[in-house]
């Protein structure tokens, strides 16, 4: 058990040294970002966020418009169906009255 712990520690230290050297190389080869580049990235991010919010707002208003239009259509269909049901009820009353009078 003690040997495996020691071996694990040795391997871990070697890996850490390798990863640290890689990190150093990567950092030294990457160009440093200037304040202007950071500011430009922030401005671009804010502008993209603005465009996304504007597109979302337009989509939301379009969905509301669709809901209103569909509501108008449904109310119209309900009114027509109710009118037809009343007409059928009146017709049914007339037919039954005729049947009673003819008997």
UniProtKB/Swiss-Prot annotation:
Belongs to the IQD family. Residues 10-22 are annotated as: Calmodulin-binding. It is found in: Nucleus, Nucleolus; Cell membrane. Its main location: nucleus. GO terms for biological process: response to calcium ion. Keywords: Calmodulin-binding, Cell membrane, Membrane, Nucleus, Repeat. GO terms for molecular function: calmodulin binding. Residues 36-62, 63-87 form the IQ domain. It comes from the Eukaryota. Interacts with calmodulin (CaM and CML) at the plasma membrane in a calcium ion Ca(2+)- independent manner, however, Ca(2+) seems to modulate calmodulin binding. Binds to multiple calmodulin (CaM) in the presence of Ca(2+) and CaM-like proteins. May be involved in cooperative interactions with calmodulins or calmodulin-like proteins. Recruits calmodulin proteins to microtubules, thus being a potential scaffold in cellular signaling and trafficking. May associate with nucleic acids and regulate gene expression at the transcriptional or post-transcriptional level. PANTHER family: IQ-DOMAIN 5-RELATED, PROTEIN IQ-DOMAIN 20. It comes from Arabidopsis thaliana (Mouse-ear cress). GO terms for cellular component: nucleolus; plasma membrane. This is Protein IQ-DOMAIN 20.
